[in-house]
Amino acid sequence: MKIKAQIGMVMNLDKCIGCHTCSVTCKNTWTNRSGAEYMYFNNVETKPGIGYPKQWEDQDKYKGGWTLKKGKLELKSGSKTNRLAGLFYNPNQPSIDDYYEPWNYDYETLTNSPQKKHQPVARPKSSLTGDFMNIEWGPNWEDDLAGGHITGLEDPNVQKMEESIKTEFDDVFMMYLPRICEHCINPACVSSCPSGAMYKREEDGIVLVDQNACRSWRYCVSSCPYKKVYFNWQTNKAEKCTLCFPRLEAGLPTICSETCVGRIRYLGVMLYDADKVEEAASVENEKDLYHSQLDVFLDPNDPEVAKLAKEQGIPAEWIEAAQQSPIYKMIIDWKIALPLHPEYRTLPMVWYIPPLSPIMNLFEGKGSRQTAEDIFPAIDQMRIPIDYLAQLLTAGDTDHIRSTLKKMSVMRQYMRAVQTNKSIDPELISSVGLTEQQIEDMYRLLAIAKYDDRFVIPSSHREEVSDLYAEQGSCGLSFSGGPGSCF
């Protein structure tokens, strides 16, 4: 058993209000510079929709992630020989039109224009070419299902649903999906990089790019199934979400988590067995990948696991943080968090609690007071949102989605009964595999958790480096145009 520690995140989609605060603060922190105008390390998509970049979930087009070939894992982009043969021609990556052409406005026209009969107009100007342009797409073009009746049907998750219910999806529900790099346990981007510039940090599992080693091959861009690796056209280097590692090293949460208005994000440590990773990612049936990844995780409260972890060099503070991890409770204990597209076989480490509110609003009506006994049959009958969430989070297995939504529904019903001094059927609680204490713990963590409850982050264990907290905001990369550069 080879034990490793990994920083992970869980997002509660039931609380996301789609305000894009996380996107704005992330962009102002990391990609507010030349060459990175089109990059959003964090973006919020409205689903159903084709997302950013367009149709990023269509791996037949982009060849991202892993596939099984004769029982062995192989990159969907092909073998090493195939990638070497096409080293100077990689057609499977998004173009700027798939992201969007960034623009600004010619505000000088407004301030410097002489008196005219007609009001001057600030026309959009491309940030790439400097020419005037027509705006045809943007990173949140589909916000709140804008144009969803057109682009929504092109969503790969919708296309996998039954033909008879495709055309009705936009009348059923919508949801927000915040996305960052998944910092996968089995990252395809790391394995595909010809120059070895992509790497996964040993101490915390964060996936980063060695800017000095990057040679602009861009196989990381196409091989990432979540399309969260970008190419900086100014520096000719790959860039991606860093999980704000300078903040994590100082024991602080990521900037997207810190500024989240809905408080949907949770950060914590997970221990996993590195020897089981290949086996977990190689299961034949895609619907078994969720359970196989659960088997990779280790119980930090097990004395034997804690002892072995300490012997293998994991600091005591990290083991203690893993024992108090909020994401361990949601992923392992309560099983209400699910991985995004586990069928990509990358074993992602940003998990999601599926949203119950769209389904409840449809069935109950806003402000209604239906009981869990009434809602359970409705959850079973609502094929469209259940099927869609299953394509998104469980490789098409609807049983896990139904189980999670029923747990969330029982939690709502139980806490409503507690608040109004009413009783609730104990069999209803036991039917979802939870106890009253677990439901109360779920409520505290999901609804009223304090800052220190949501973010359990051990500081870095580098005794011989300088003060990381004091150095935040100072020089990062040494070349001009790099993130955090002083030049």
From Swiss-Prot:
GO terms for biological process: anaerobic respiration; nitrate assimilation. Its EC number is 1.7.5.1. Its main location: membrane. Gene3D superfamilies: 3.30.70.20, nitrate reductase domain like. Binds 3 [4Fe-4S] clusters per subunit. It is a peripheral membrane protein. GO terms for molecular function: 3 iron, 4 sulfur cluster binding; 4 iron, 4 sulfur cluster binding; electron transfer activity; metal ion binding; nitrate reductase (quinone) activity. The keyword 4Fe-4S applies. Keywords: 3Fe-4S, 4Fe-4S, Cell membrane, Electron transport, Iron, Iron-sulfur, Membrane, Metal-binding, Nitrate assimilation, Oxidoreductase, Repeat, Transport. [4Fe-4S] cluster 3 binds at residues 181, 184, 189, 224. GO terms for cellular component: membrane; nitrate reductase complex; plasma membrane. NCBIfam families: narH. This is Nitrate reductase beta chain. The gene is narH.
